[in-house]
């Protein structure tokens, strides 16, 4: 996603095209985007779309693990089946793989602190979307979730105070998994 001076791009584009990813036809995925900063802006928008999908996947896994009481193996198998049902996505595929990752005998996810940081790109993207009257609720929810996750001490204190525990759902698991899949698909 190069941008800036056209003459400079013309000088380096042969090298960029050699190292760039290729599309299904073998053409390099490189094109001049525009003036200074345009490439960064496009990358920011791209990242914000992924940011929203990652949050949706986090919520999907959370609902399946704590609401449906599925194991990581069952969740992984379910997500992999979705990729064969028209929901092909790199993030979906790697999430299914990450769910099975272990360190020793323990699942890696059980060792990860439930606290995410942020550098500001999600907030910048959200501010820009709002400025131009573009609604993208997965991004706004992702930014909010990251803010909340950063307040781990407060979250734990409130959970203790209110005694909140995520209870299992009472409906049929097959029906609920289909509803979760449809909600995930809707956000994409």
Q: What is each of the regions a protein language model found here?
A:
Residues 1-13, 43-51:
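Short beta-strand and adjoining strand-loop segment in the mid-core
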Residues 16:
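Conserved phosphate-handling catalytic cores of large alpha/beta enzymes
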Residues 21-49, 68-87, 96, 100-116, ...:
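Conserved Rossmann-fold dehydrogenase catalytic segment
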Residues 44, 59, 124-125:
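A general alpha-helix detector
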Residues 54:
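Long, contiguous binding/interaction regions
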Residues 61-65, 127-131:
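Short glycine/serine- and small hydrophobic-enriched flexible loop segments
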Residues 119-130, 136-144, 151-158, 174-177:
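Segments forming oxygen-rich coordination pockets for charged ligands
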């Amino acid at each position: 996603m190069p941008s800036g001076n056209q003459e400079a791009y013309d000088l380096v584009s042969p090298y960029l095209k050699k190292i760039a990813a290729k599309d299904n036809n073998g053409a390099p995925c490189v094109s001049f985007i525009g003036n200074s900063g345009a490439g960064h802006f496009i990358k920011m928008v791209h990242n914000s779309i992924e940011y929203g999908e990652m949050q949706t996947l986090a919520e999907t896994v959370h609902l399946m693990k704590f609401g449906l009481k599925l194991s990581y193996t069952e969740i992984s198998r379910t997500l992999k089946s979705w990729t064969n049902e028209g929901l092909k996505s790199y993030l979906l595929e790697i999430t299914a793989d990450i769910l099975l990752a272990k360190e020793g005998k323990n699942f890696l996810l059980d060792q990860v602190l439930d606290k995410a940081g942020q550098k500001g790109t999600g907030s910048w993207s959200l501010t820009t979307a709002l400025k131009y009257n573009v609604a993208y609720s997965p991004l706004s929810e992702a930014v909010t979730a990251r803010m909340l996750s950063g307040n781990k001490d407060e979250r734990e204190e409130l959970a203790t105070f209110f005694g909140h525990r995520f209870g299992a759902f009472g409906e049929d698991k097959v029906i609920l998994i289909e509803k979760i899949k449809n909600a995930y698909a809707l956000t994409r």
